[in-house]
UniProtKB/Swiss-Prot annotation:
Function text: Phosphorylation of dTMP to form dTDP in both de novo and salvage pathways of dTTP synthesis.
Enzyme class: transferase
Domain of life of the native organism: Bacteria
Name listed for the protein in its UniProt record: Thymidylate kinase
E.C. code: 2.7.4.9
Similarity section: Belongs to the thymidylate kinase family.
HAMAP family: Thymidylate_kinase
Keyword terms: ATP-binding, Kinase, Nucleotide biosynthesis, Nucleotide-binding, Transferase
Reaction it catalyzes: dTMP + ATP = dTDP + ADP
Keyword Ubl conjugation: no
Species for this entry: Nitrosomonas europaea (strain ATCC 19718 / CIP 103999 / KCTC 2705 / NBRC 14298)
Length: 215
């Protein structure tokens, strides 16, 4: 059986990434694929428990503790959800993955990239998403969207400066991995953003089909 593909969706809080997950799931299902939609932190019983701890605004923690908890949740996520799904041929779509750790704990909190690199290698070995769609919005746009949706969690309560560091870290990742990370202007009209996402996913699908045909 052919191994499934791994797609991740990234962006600062309020970028609108979650809005497009349902569309992406339907697109892949229409191709006749089994699709597993999940999220980080979370995706497993332990991961969801860690998520509650990480998002609780009453719970202060050292930046490196935060990074370690994120990767602990990720290890469980890989073992219980992501790898089994990929091995049986399913496609996995995750709301955030390791790029978020480099952006939030690295860029936002200042955890050294070398430490995150080591954690990534230890937890994931050679596993990396096949495609990442990053929704980029100015910090002020993301903040305005959040203010009208829900009570802020521990990350959402951070300053604009924090989110600017996170955003810049994401953009640096996109420059570092241009073949994998595709940037979408999330500040555009919803219909325009959907069109951009559709083009990216269609191109990815076409490239896969061409490769399989040649093989």
């Amino acid at each position: 059986m052919q191994r499934g593909k791994f797609i991740t969706v990234e962006g600062i809080d309020g970028a609108g990434k979650s809005t497009h997950l349902a569309w992406l799931e339907r697109f892949l299902q229409d191709k006749g694929l089994e699709v597993v939609v999940t999220r980080e932190p979370g995706g497993t019983a332990l991961g969801e428990a860690l998520r509650q701890l990480l998002l609780d605004h009453r719970q202060a923690m050292h930046p490196e503790t935060e990074a370690l908890l994120m990767f602990a949740a990720r290890r469980e996520h890989l073992d219980k959800v992501i790898l089994p799904a990929l091995d049986r041929g399913a496609w996995v779509v995750s709301d955030r993955f390791t790029d978020a750790s480099f952006a939030y704990q690295g860029g936002g909190r200042g955890v050294a990239q070398s430490k995150l690199d080591n954690l990534e290698q230890w937890v994931q070995a050679e596993l990396s998403p096949d495609l990442t769609v990053y929704f980029d919005v100015p910090v002020i746009v993301g903040r305005e969207r959040l203010q009208s949706t829900r009570v802020a969690d521990r990350f959402e309560m951070e300053s604009n400066l924090f989110f600017e560091r996170v955003r810049q870290a994401y953009l640096q990742r996109a420059e570092q991995f241009p073949q994998r990370i595709r940037v979408v202007d999330g500040s555009r009209l919803l219909a325009e953003v959907k069109t951009a996402v559709a083009e990216i996913v269609e191109d990815f699908w076409s490239d896969l089909s061409d490769t399989q045909f040649r093989g």
